[in-house]
């Protein structure tokens, strides 16, 4: 079995199809982990979801901020913005099947491969969290999303406060911090206070902030973390982190990594993407 991770697809189904062909993906033999943001901004989000559903258990996605936004828009708790390209899902005859499938995906995954652990999230992991805590906290949100109370949670999910984790947090505040860390965070303070304003590259960190993966004392330092979300960061391949959002929807490329016999043995694949959105438009 070959193990792959792929970055943000964001509704670019043609690029997704070409990438699957490039890697020679076999649903009966391989596993493909999609690091969130399957939908939105690209031309055919519905086709991406249908393709993933058709490929069955061989495709194992995470929820990203755009996927949560789709759920909120679909269930009436968030108005679509003018830049959204979600109508193909919202008006589709199989919309309920796609939304239910998406709602039951996790916010974090971990896989043991070649003697090591790979932790996968869409955006980031707070420096205070261990890998085990990350999975447990993600599970708290997943339990609510997959319950009958999910619509109420989606209505209360949005907001930038609190921006600092405490294990004493409860209720909506606790779940919001977890969601924001896993699906929105790029920069944080050295003590883990999240910033939601800057979308610049890691080398242009605002004063007093660092990329989340460079926070001092990060407790997941010895676990390889694969993530997406940060298109201005681009491809990042370090011993401890692997960033795979290479800006497909912005005219960059859609990237995947194939792991060999160990997590350190990895190879990048990518396909070029036509520009579907103009930054700042």
Swiss-Prot record:
Provide the top EC class.
hydrolase
Q: Name one Pfam family in it.
A: Metallophos
Keyword Hydrolase (UniProt): yes
UniProt EC number:
3.6.1.41
Q: Does the keyword Signal apply?
A: no
Gene Ontology terms, MF aspect: bis(5'-nucleosyl)-tetraphosphatase (symmetrical) activity
Under the heading InterPro entries, the entry gives: ApaH, Calcineurin-like_PHP_ApaH, Metallo-depent_PP-like
Which reaction does this chain catalyze?
P(1),P(4)-bis(5'-adenosyl) tetraphosphate + H2O = 2 ADP + 2 H(+)
**Keywords attached to this entry:** Hydrolase
| Membership in a protein family | Belongs to the Ap4A hydrolase family.
HAMAP family in the record: ApaH
Q: What does this protein do?
A: Hydrolyzes diadenosine 5',5'''-P1,P4-tetraphosphate to yield ADP.
Its name, as the record gives it, is Bis(5'-nucleosyl)-tetraphosphatase, symmetrical
């Amino acid at each position: 079995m070959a193990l792959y991770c792929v970055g943000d697809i964001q509704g670019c189904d043609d690029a997704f199809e070409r990438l699957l062909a490039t890697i020679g993906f076999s649903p009966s033999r391989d596993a493909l982990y999609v690091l969130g943001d399957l939908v939105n901004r690209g031309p055919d989000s519905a086709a991406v979801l249908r393709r993933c559903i058709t490929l069955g258990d061989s495709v194992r996605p995470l929820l990203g901020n755009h996927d949560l936004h789709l759920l909120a828009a679909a269930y009436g708790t968030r108005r679509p913005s003018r830049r959204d390209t979600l109508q193909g899902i919202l008006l589709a005859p199989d919309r309920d099947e796609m939304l239910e499938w998406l709602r039951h995906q996790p916010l974090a995954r971990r896989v043991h491969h070649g003697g090591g652990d790979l932790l996968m999230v869409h955006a980031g992991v707070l420096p205070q969290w261990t890998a085990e805590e990350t999975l447990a906290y993600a599970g708290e949100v997943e339990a609510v999303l997959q319950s009958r109370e999910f619509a109420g949670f989606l209505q209360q999910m949005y907001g930038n406060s609190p921006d600092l984790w405490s294990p004493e947090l409860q209720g909506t505040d606790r779940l919001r911090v977890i969601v924001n860390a896993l699906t929105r965070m790029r920069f944080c303070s050295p003590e883990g206070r999240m910033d939601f304003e800057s979308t610049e590259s890691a080398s242009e960190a605002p004063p007093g902030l660092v990329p989340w993966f460079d926070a001092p004392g990060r407790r997941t330092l010895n676990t390889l973390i694969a993530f997406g979300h940060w298109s201005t960061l681009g491809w990042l391949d370090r011993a401890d982190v692997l960033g795979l959002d290479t800006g497909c929807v912005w005219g960059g490329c859609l990237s995947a990594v194939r792991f060999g016999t160990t997590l350190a043995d990895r190879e990048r694949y990518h396909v070029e993407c036509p520009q579907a959105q103009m930054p700042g438009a």
